[in-house]
Amino acid sequence: HAELLEQVKEDLKKEGIDLKIVIFNDYVQPNMGLKDKSLDANFFQHVPYMDDFGKKNGFEMSAVGNIHIEPMAAYSKKIKSLNELKDGAEVLLPNDPTNLGRALIMLDKAGFIKLKDNTKLDSTVQDIVQNTKKIKFTTLAADQIAPRLGEVDAAVINANYAIDTGLTTADAILIESKDSPYANIVTVLKGNEADPKVAKLVKALQSEKIKKFIEEKYKGSVIPAF
């Protein structure tokens, strides 16, 4: 995300906007920064996560622009395809409600497990109604999964953490479909949707220049969503 913002920093300067980029290593502080008004906008989440976070923390946010999708994927150091998973194998999944549901829906759509309802975005391991291989699903914080990939049979990893550890979708044994509702968005506190600074930021991020940058740099690990 920061890389994309760096790409538009100079363009925004010409528009009279001094873009200050603040990098966080978790999924909580960027939203709390909107709430306490220390940030004008953030760029890290998708709508299901934003809605869930707002509900739990008692404030509303708005999505003001889709920028890209980071397809979630399953990886393994031990097998080359999901079908090779042995009975009772251990698979790591992210533990926050949105990404856990997202991971389970991906596994359901691949025919690997069956969920009670594969449109329910906040499905949990308890919603699995068919697990023929008796896979042991362990849930962990999203940022802790990639470092532990070697200890388990397979793991579902968010693209940003996969990229950080040098994994690409070419290494994946399963990739989420491109029509996922999980595009990364620019987010503001509800009521600030008309902020002209933010409108210019979104316009810069949805430019042809950024589209090209995403396609050339990430080669499918990240895809434009505009």
Regions inferred by a protein language model and the residue ranges of each:
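Short, polar/charged alpha-helical segment
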Residues: 1-20
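Periplasmic-binding protein-like
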Residues: 101-108, 205-225
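A conserved helix-loop-strand patch within extracytoplasmic ligand-binding domains
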Residues: 64-113, 211-212
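A bilobed periplasmic-binding-protein/Venus flytrap-type ligand-binding module shared by bacterial periplasmic
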Residues: 71-82, 183-195
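Alpha-to-beta junction loops
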Residues: 35-45, 89, 112, 133-136, ...
